[in-house]
Amino acid sequence: YFMDKYLNNGCVIPEDMLEENIRIDYNKLRMLIRKDKNFTHDASVIQDLVTCGFVVGELKAGFPAERICEPDNFISLLYYFGLVTIAGTYRGKTRFVIPNEVVREQVFKYLLDTYDENGLSVDVRKHDGLEEGLAYDGNWKSYFQNISDSIYLFSSQRDKQKGESFVHGFTLAMTCQNQFYRPVSEYPNQEGYADIFLLPLLDIYKDIQHSYVVELKYVKSNASEAEIEVKTHDAEKQVCKYAETEMVRLGARSTHLHRIVIVYRGVEMVVCKES
């Protein structure tokens, strides 16, 4: 689909990266999944996949429909629908990852839809305006504050959403829906994301003025101010180091690159600054 549109459009990247027919399996998947109002089964697997970049489990050849929400069964369903692929092992278990950017869009969309089904909807019109301000005016603080406000509000409604997976997962899902950027995350270790580079889609929106490297840190809700200070200092060093990588320098091109440090204590954003 991509190559066909690209070559037949004078080698210009198509605005819609996703062919509609690929959504068929995604819709089937949503029909099969039980709407879990406690937000504990299917969504938690997706949150782990988004936050850590991978999930581990055992590939099942078959299982009854009523047991779809068991983690191994749900992961197997994702595999058979092509939403994850096998990428080796981790601690003796099969390691599953998202295979490509097209599928990544579906996974993030599923996560956002699951939030919405559980009453965790966001003001789309407001967020669209903040996305525009992020890209063209450099208004990064209001953009990330809006995400933070949503996280705080939603976690107050459902205690089980509290935690690092929810904070990271929701932030990544929201940035993935930003029409002006493609979030690129690095995996320096098995513990998850270290940095997020909001790669400006300059081939589509040639007048984007700003790009961003974001270091997102998390501490528990009972963490002290000293712990937050240490996390902030670590984040500042890491975000500056990441900003100097070749991938970021080439991706940012002529835009103004911002180095953003964010620290959450529980579900409350306590640091949001430019380094």
Regions found by a protein language model. Give the residues of each.
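Extended alpha-helical interface modules used as scaffolds for assembling large macromolecular complexes
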Residues: 2-236, 241-243, 272-275
